[in-house]
Amino acid sequence: INMKNDAKVITPQEYWDNLSDIQYYMDEPVADPAAIALYFLSQEAAKKVKVVLSGEGSDELFGGYNIYCEPLEHTSFNKIPMPIRRMLGNFAERCLPRGMKGRGFLMRHGKTLEERYFANATNIFTEREANRILKKGCKPGIQKVTAPLYERVKDKDSVTKMQYVDMHLWLVHDILMKGDKMGMANSLEVRVPFLDKKVLELAQTQVGGQAV
């Protein structure tokens, strides 16, 4: 389409030289490495424009994340009674080596969706590992955060539940915050047309899993 794209290679030295500033602009610890690339992208865009359009919200509204396919792809496995799946999940976590194919699958499906899914993010530690590391007053309690959200969509299908949780946690507290702060750090306004009210209303007309 005869489109001219600008490219920038971030050197290791640039990374380390700017890391402390990037963290300062984020205001709080955020374990999302995309913030660094977004900072440099905003820096380059700000050389030519003051306002940009971004696609934040499209994946959450229209089922763009691969993880949303999981409930649809593994319906047969999920017919196995939950007590058996829990046993398999516990066995995988305790006995199978990290990185072994199938370990993560068994661990995920050894729990209900409400127990295992809190955002479109990767766990660094299992709950058992986190319990061994953290002090007693800091035990992981993510379900205290997600339970009210799941309660609001308890009658919906699994894909819709995942999208709902992502829209209220992942999108708000990571995606939008990161885009806004990295843009503003470079005096760049980042607008998100997919989160227009009418687009949201259109997305809500989809039957569960339809977009996926």
Set out the residue ranges of the language-model regions.
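ATP-dependent adenylate-handling active sites, centered on carboxylate activation for C-N bond formation
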Residues: I1-G141, S158, K181-V212
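Structural motif
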Residues: A31, V153-D166
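A short, charged helix-loop
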Residues: P140-E151
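Short Ser/Thr-interspersed hydrophobic loop/turn segments at strand-loop and sheet-helix junctions
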Residues: M167-K181, A203
